[in-house]
């Protein structure tokens, strides 16, 4: 039985859209999102890829068009955790076009860490052809689109954000310090990047492991389409203060697809990977997929359902996780200065010999 618990106020955020861009361009959240869901429209996806800017953008001197914030509380019914209500997170957002070619973006969780921060260069040739390069703390735009950019509730697919293999903490949608280059030509968008790997979760191993990723997307209508993903990285297993450590050379591959219409979106992905660890045989393996359907019966509500199935295999055996999640999201209000929504989300997760009923209350107010 699924038990719905919770509510979420969220902002019109491209993958967490922020009111500063609604103020700057004097547009509704539905310009970039299938509001009240976070699903990106063709305009929103192109806005994200270009560097949080529209074609031909330049600097805007009004500081209210460059800065925004949101406050977030969360309650997890499965664990009974109330820490977020007692100590809310505050996020500072800043960015947009700085010059004819340069733009920037910052998402700083004041309570914890900088979640994203990068400077971006974009050179345009017409409406649907441009080159772009970024440097800073970032993640592939393909993962941002199918992760937060697909959100209708408060959670991301397991294979993108939660499932890890043995002691390697890598998940595809995490952010890392690095650089990447990309470009759009008509319906195609490609991106390649080099990142500092993590030897300790959340701590960049500068000058040691360098991770590499590449993506390729085809979106005939600007948003519906398919995408390919590849990541190769390294990780040192063991205690860095008590060598020797074991080198973990790993790779992940994936295929993504979605079909979007004004009233619904069907999306999914399959990812596979292996970890080759010195002295450990056979190779450790991870695979998983998800399918999600969003529905938009009116301008004030979005409903959705998602199924996740992941499997990890190592020398200790195999672990399979299956999860079903449902939700409904309601618009509370929407203005250029502040926006809010309420989302209800519930799920059931099954692992060998056990199951857990899930419910999350997530409250976000953006201004």
PLM regions and their residue ranges:
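Bacterial N-terminal signal peptides
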Residues: 2-10
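Sec/Tat signal peptide C-region and signal peptidase I cleavage site
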Residues: 9-17
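The canonical Cys-X-X-Cys-His
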Residues: 27-36
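Outer-membrane beta-barrel "beta-signal"
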Residues: 28, 326-332, 355-367
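Outer membrane beta-barrel
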Residues: 37-42, 63-67, 71-75, 81-199, ...
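Sequence/structural signature of outer-membrane beta-barrel proteins
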Residues: 74-80, 109-113, 140-143, 195-203, ...
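Detector for outer-membrane/organellar transmembrane beta-barrel domains
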Residues: 185, 207, 218-314, 322
